[in-house]
């Protein structure tokens, strides 16, 4: 109804693996875009135009969930929406937002106007340039500096009721629906980073050598052993990721536990492999 190729999570992870092999920052931008669009698709009534634009490649989305007071516990925002005649007004300090200032649409989280607890939340769509929303600082990371994950500030941002992306109080379950996309996509990028390190190291060892003997670096057994460890760690990471996808697609009872294991497994492999490179 809205365009796109109709592919699912496994294809998205494979695409993120491929992008991660070339540019991890671009991979993160693409991942957060996919997560944002997944939120649109889950409740499309008020976001039909951006959903069609995203399918046509004219709209970049992202998530604005993490806050200074809740840090990595993105599912428990500190900010609370205030009911207005037209919808809600939201003020929040979002600690990092990938593609901040560049994305065309932002999926923001806040506690419901009548919230009874930290997980009584809502998700909303906010377009780029909305009054009261701004980038609050630079992105100064040690790595992946190209994804512009800057903090953003929302000051009395007016959001019409039609732009709600969850049922009343339904933000938390919607976030849990998006979590597999985020965690497995992140794992795909990390696996891509590891694969790129293996390929780059292989090219270096087979392409460089010693002029006086004519031998290659790959002829040295200690370097071949390091490369073998890199290859094994990368293959294990990809195999684990495939196993998790199998569980998700089969609706296995431990699927969510497997999803949560995917990110540390793949990121750990990426660190191991790049350290060996």
Go through each PLM region and give its residues.
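Glycine-rich flavin
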Residues: 2-98
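Buried hydrophobic positions in well-ordered alpha/beta secondary-structure cores of metabolic enzymes
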Residues: 15, 36, 90-92, 124, ...
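Residue-level recognition of alpha-helical structural elements
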Residues: 46-47, 216, 223, 251-258
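A short core secondary-structure module
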Residues: 93-134
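Glycine-rich beta->alpha junctions and the first turn(s) of the following alpha-helix
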Residues: 141-233
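Extended, amphipathic, non-transmembrane alpha-helical segments
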Residues: 199-204, 237-243, 271-272
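C-terminal helix-coil-helix/basic helical segment that borders enzyme active sites and/or dimer interfaces
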Residues: 235-265
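Alpha-helix capping/hinge segments and adjacent helical runs
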Residues: 253, 264-277
């Amino acid at each position: 109804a809205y365009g796109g190729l109709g592919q699912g999570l496994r294809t998205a992870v494979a695409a993120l693996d491929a992008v991660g092999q070339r540019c991890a920052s671009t991979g993160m931008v693409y991942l957060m875009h996919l997560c944002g669009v997944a939120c649109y698709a889950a409740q499309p009534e008020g976001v039909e135009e951006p959903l069609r634009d995203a399918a046509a490649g004219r709209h970049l989305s992202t998530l604005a969930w993490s806050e200074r007071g809740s840090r990595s516990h993105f599912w428990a925002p500190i900010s609370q929406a205030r009911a207005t005649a037209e919808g809600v007004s939201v003020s929040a300090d979002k600690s990092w937002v990938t593609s901040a200032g560049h994305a065309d649409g932002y999926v923001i989280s806040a506690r419901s106007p009548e919230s009874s607890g930290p997980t009584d939340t809502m998700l909303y769509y906010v377009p780029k340039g909305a009054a009261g929303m701004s980038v609050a600082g630079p992105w100064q990371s040690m790595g992946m500096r190209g994804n512009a994950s800057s903090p953003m500030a929302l000051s009395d941002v007016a959001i019409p009721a039609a732009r709600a992306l969850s049922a009343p109080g339904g933000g938390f379950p919607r976030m849990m629906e998006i979590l597999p996309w985020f965690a497995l996509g992140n794992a795909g990028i990390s696996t891509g980073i590891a694969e790129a390190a293996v390929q780059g190291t292989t090219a270096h060892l087979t392409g460089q050598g010693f002029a006086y003997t004519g031998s290659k670096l790959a002829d040295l057994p200690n370097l071949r052993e390091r490369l073998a460890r890199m290859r094994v760690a990368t293959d294990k990471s990809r195999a684990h990721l495939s196993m998790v996808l199998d569980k998700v697609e089969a609706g296995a009872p431990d699927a969510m536990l497997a999803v949560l294991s995917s990110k540390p497994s793949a990121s750990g492999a990426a660190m191991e492999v790049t350290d060996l490179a």
